[in-house]
């Protein structure tokens, strides 16, 4: 009789431990937070994508890019572009959050939302 009772205690203890183990394996919601930033609007040219401008507001705070090629187009204008229609865009270089335009242009387009 004592052996039967011991088996039950061990079995219940093992089940309780397993339940606690699986209960702690749940993924927390904040595990996939990669910094909380906001993505920049980008335009493509068939082979590369570049940001439209070099600064924007993210949750009320400014975010800027530096030392990267950009299109000298505001995010507002880029968002109004018709997807998959080619446009002529001025190229520039991000410097302290401003896309400094140079004397080059290239075809650019806004991708479709499904991409």
From Swiss-Prot:
Q: Does the keyword tRNA-binding apply?
A: no
Q: Where is the signal peptide?
A: 1-25
Q: State any GO CC term.
A: extracellular region
Gene Ontology MF term list: C-C chemokine binding
Q: Which cysteines are joined by disulfide bonds?
A: 38-58, 54-94, 70-99, 89-108
Residues carrying a glycan? 45, 72, 103
Provide this UniProt record's keywords sorted from A to Z. Answer: Disulfide bond, Glycoprotein, Secreted, Signal
Tell me the compartments it is located in.
Secreted
Annotated function = Salivary chemokine-binding protein which binds to host chemokines CCL3 and CCL4.
User: What name has this protein been given in UniProt?
Assistant: Evasin P1181
The species this protein was found in: Amblyomma maculatum
């Amino acid at each position: 009789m004592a052996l039967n009772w011991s088996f039950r205690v061990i079995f219940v203890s093992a089940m309780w431990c397993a339940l606690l183990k699986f209960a702690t394996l749940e993924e927390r919601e904040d595990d996939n937070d990669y910094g909380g930033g906001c993505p920049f609007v980008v335009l493509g040219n068939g082979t590369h994508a570049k940001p439209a401008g070099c600064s924007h507001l993210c949750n009320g705070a400014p975010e800027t890019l530096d030392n990267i090629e950009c299109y000298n187009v505001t995010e507002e204008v880029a968002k109004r572009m018709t997807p998959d229609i080619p446009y002529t865009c001025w190229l520039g270089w991000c410097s302290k959050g401003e896309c400094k335009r140079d004397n080059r242009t290239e075809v650019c387009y806004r991708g479709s939302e499904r991409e």
